[in-house]
């Protein structure tokens, strides 16, 4: 018996990606339903070679839904995820609404799949922040080998992480530069075309942004609360793909060659690390791919037991949609979820 899957936020960047990945991976779904707000009702979205008509979230009966992939933002998730969970569906939420709730597992399957069993408290599982997901995939195998003490990470995050309007703004501003038209800032506080913005999400009292706080708090919850981490998150004029420069200090010695070999055999990682021009991965190559790509692995001579690396991933896939579907697959493979009997 297959599963009934509802995708909430099906008209957004991540929702559309979820529908595509469900089809690509041949997820065992007998039925897939596309849901969104009332203003999107009737919109067509693609699910493989099929077209789904978007239905209204507000009027949908979730009693026979097995899995709800929620990608409609934090406010919608706060209101609807508990109701959907009570109706008996497992909600896998892509927003930040539930990530730090102690009764909600925060899961990256390559890193902490065992924690997924805790979903039964609220029938909700949280998907991490896009920049966190690729970071912990790269850190986990190294942490297992040499125990990480401290991480300093600088991110180079694409505009798709801020939604379709942000992608449109980058496109229109880039075009405006060449046509000598006025550049209009709506989504970003400063122009994004041919620029970088060291500010993602709101500022916190300590001077960090909320995006930076998410990376620090989520990495501790997923990987190890003892790890010290500092993040600087930067928006760059790239459409898809997040990049990170990561400096790691370990408790125990680990060489660059050891790290390279460990990461080559780690789930979700793909090492492309040649010390030559072009022997590394950029966000352009990572777009549309599932892996977390790791390059520029080298020892840091300024700190004992230090390494530096570069990691890149498609933020709409591993950073969001793919990770959510991998969580659903994890529940099924571990027999933590069985399909409801549907009315004939």
Each PLM stretch: what is its role?
Residues 231-232, 237-267:
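Internal helical hairpin/lid segments
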Residues 253-287:
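Terminal hydrophobic/aromatic helix or amphipathic segment near a protein terminus
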């Amino acid at each position: 018996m297959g599963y009934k899957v509802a995708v909430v936020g099906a008209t957004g960047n991540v929702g559309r990606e979820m529908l595509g990945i469900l089809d690509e991976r041949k997820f065992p779904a007998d039925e897939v339903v596309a849901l969104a707000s009332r203003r999107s009702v009737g919109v067509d979205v693609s699910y493989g070679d099929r077209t789904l008509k978007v239905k209204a979230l507000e009027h949908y009966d979730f009693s026979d839904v097995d899995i709800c992939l929620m990608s409609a933002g934090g406010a919608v998730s706060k209101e609807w995820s508990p109701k959907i969970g009570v109706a008996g569906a497992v909600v896998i939420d892509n927003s930040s609404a539930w990530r730090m709730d102690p009764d909600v597992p925060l899961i990256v399957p390559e890193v902490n799949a065992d924690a997924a069993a805790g979903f039964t408290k609220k029938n909700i599982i949280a998907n991490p922040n896009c920049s966190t997901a690729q970071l912990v995939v790269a850190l986990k195998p190294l942490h297992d080998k040499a125990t990480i003490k401290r991480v300093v990470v600088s991110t180079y995050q694409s505009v798709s992480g801020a939604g379709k309007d942000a992608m449109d703004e980058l496109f229109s501003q880039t075009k405006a530069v060449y046509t000598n038209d006025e550049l209009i800032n709506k989504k970003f506080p400063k122009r994004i075309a041919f620029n970088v913005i060291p500010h993602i999400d709101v500022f916190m009292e300590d001077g960090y942004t909320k995006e930076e706080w998410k990376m620090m708090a989520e990495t501790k919850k997923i990987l190890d609360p003892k790890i010290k981490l500092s993040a600087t998150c930067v928006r760059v004029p790239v459409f898809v793909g997040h990049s990170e420069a990561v400096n790691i200090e370990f408790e125990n010695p680990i060489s660059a060659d050891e790290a390279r070999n460990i990461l080559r055999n780690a789930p979700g990682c793909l090492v492309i690390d040649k010390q030559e021009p072009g022997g590394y991965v950029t966000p352009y190559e990572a777009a549309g791919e599932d892996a977390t790509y790791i390059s520029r692995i080298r020892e840091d001579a300024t700190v004992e037991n230090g390494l530096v690396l570069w990691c890149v991933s498609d933020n709409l896939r591993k950073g969001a949609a793919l990770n959510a579907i991998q969580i659903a697959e994890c529940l099924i493979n571990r027999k933590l979820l069985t399909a409801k009997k549907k009315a004939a």
